[in-house]
Amino acid sequence: MSPSIHKCKAGFLWSPELETFDFGSKHPIRVGRFQMVRDFLQETRFLEHPNVKIIKPKPLARSLLSRIHSQEYLEKVRKISETGKGEIDIDTPGFKGIYNNARITSGATVTGVEAIHSKKVCHTYSPTGGFHHARYETGGGFCIFNDVAASVYRLKDLGYERILIADFDVHHGNGTQAYFYDDSGVMQISFHEDPEWIYPHDGFIEDIGEGEGLGYNINMHFPMDSGDEVYRYAFDRIVPPLFNFYQPDFILFLPGFDAHYDDPMTHLNLTMNTIRYVTEEIHAAAHRWASGRLSVISGGGYNREVFRYGAGVVMSVLTGAVFNPPTQTPPFEDDDEIWAVVKENTQKVQDLVFSALGI
């Protein structure tokens, strides 16, 4: 039986070690990002909630590192870490200590899933993680080590057979997709902006997996300026049937703070209302199918106020505590052209994926 939604303990992953990074003063990922979330949750009294437990993250185990990344790539990161010179890719500069920082920021996610497995908590929220662009042979897109892939491997070791990744980050998780593209033991659902307009320029609807994984890789992408109504239209027609079919025993969730209309690096038009809606639906699905086992990983989000409010919304859903961010009015409404594209894309996902799975 799933624990009661109101009695379920939520773990918050926190340690000052998470802040030991420096991509540079002009980089979108700035020092203080994770401390900011922790301070906001302290100010709003979420961290004093009786159902919240602070969990100190452990560095990502070297045994997991060697499974998710090549030795050549790990050696490259070590050398950059020692000298402070070099880069992971053009958007991801190196710095002294990057190897150990990446181990702790990615290790936070794995620490969280282990805490859920051991029943210390049934949900976790990490202000870091969601490094879904890192691939076996390289990092990129602000991502060094792929914590999502590492968590899946750890969960498989612990005996989980139906792991669902619900990735609502506005950028497609190309790295994570590559790890499990032929694996029916992992279902990946990604809602993201049209790859034509945004990094990493992949994650097309036609990419539905292969071999044993055919139909288990789901990509739904949205045109620029898509807002709350079209997003929920697609969500309601795609996501619940997939959950009902797959009946996951563990859920990893990236809530997509960077899909907000005020994010400076992206082009969707969502408000906190939809981020809350998606979080509530995923949370309810975790209790229905996975005995509450839900790991929430912040992922992207480059407006600091939005990132704070997103963290508050997540913790509100996980704990049942009240949190109401300011009323928000996006600059655009969903027009007829956006509606036409989203309806067509939604139907295409249903035609390709549902037929492959027999839904």
Task: Give a label for each model feature.
Residues 1-63:
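N-terminal low-complexity, Ser/Thr- and acidic-residue-enriched intrinsically disordered segments
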Residues 2-13, 19, 75-359:
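A general "terminal functional-core" signal
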Residues 30, 34, 58, 66-70, ...:
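Generic structural signal for well-ordered secondary structure
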Residues 35, 66-67, 136, 148:
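A broadly tuned "polar low-complexity/structure-edge" signature
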Residues 44-50, 72, 119, 159:
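Short glycine-centered helix-capping/turn motifs at secondary-structure transition points
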Residues 57-82:
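Charged, often glycine-rich, active-site loop that binds/positions anionic groups
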